[in-house]
């Protein structure tokens, strides 16, 4: 009897997910977004039910936490929108690098 019980125990489904931080680059219909992760991969993100029911707005340029499955790394669930003061702007750093390159080439 105890052997069957051990076989039926379910593992925590959250263990199969990895959490990343990313930047929303494009808003798509039906609560879908393109998100650029910290490692520069772009994935499709959808809003979790808790965020949807709380009516939290997610816009382009927002930093978000996203859960990605280990089995399908092309899609993820947006679980948290980071406050603007805590977020470091990836776009700003890349734009400033581009500006430095342009000004260096003019000299």
Curated annotation (Swiss-Prot):
Homology family: Belongs to the IF-1 family.
Keywords: Chloroplast, Initiation factor, Plastid, Protein biosynthesis, RNA-binding, rRNA-binding
Database matches in InterPro entries: NA-bd_OB-fold (IPR012340), RNA-binding_domain_S1_IF1 (IPR006196), S1_domain (IPR003029), TIF_IF1 (IPR004368)
SMART domains: S1 (SM00316)
Protein name (record): Translation initiation factor IF-1, chloroplastic
UniProt entry tagged with the keyword Metal-binding: no
Domain S1-like: 8-83
Assembly: Component of the 30S ribosomal translation pre-initiation complex which assembles on the 30S ribosome in the order IF-2 and IF-3, IF-1 and N-formylmethionyl-tRNA(fMet); mRNA recruitment can occur at any time during PIC assembly.
Primary location group: plastid
Subcellular localization: Plastid, Chloroplast
Functional note: One of the essential components for the initiation of protein synthesis. Stabilizes the binding of IF-2 and IF-3 on the 30S subunit to which N-formylmethionyl-tRNA(fMet) subsequently binds. Helps modulate mRNA selection, yielding the 30S pre-initiation complex (PIC). Upon addition of the 50S ribosomal subunit IF-1, IF-2 and IF-3 are released leaving the mature 70S translation initiation complex.
Classification via SUPFAM superfamilies: Nucleic acid-binding proteins (SSF50249)
Gene: infA
Record's GO cellular component terms: chloroplast; cytosol
Gene Ontology molecular function terms on file: ribosome binding; rRNA binding; translation initiation factor activity
């Amino acid at each position: 009897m105890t052997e069957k019980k051990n076989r039926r125990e379910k593992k925590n489904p959250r263990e199969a997910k990895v959490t990343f931080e990313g930047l929303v680059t494009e808003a798509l219909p039906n609560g879908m977004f393109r998100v650029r992760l910290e490692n520069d991969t772009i994935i499709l993100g959808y809003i979790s039910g808790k965020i949807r029911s709380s009516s939290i707005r997610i816009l382009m340029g927002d930093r978000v936490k996203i859960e990605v499955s280990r089995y399908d790394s092309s899609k993820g669930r947006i679980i948290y929108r980071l406050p603007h003061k805590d977020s470091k702007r990836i776009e700003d750093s890349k734009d400033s690098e581009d500006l430095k390159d342009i000004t260096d080439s003019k000299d």
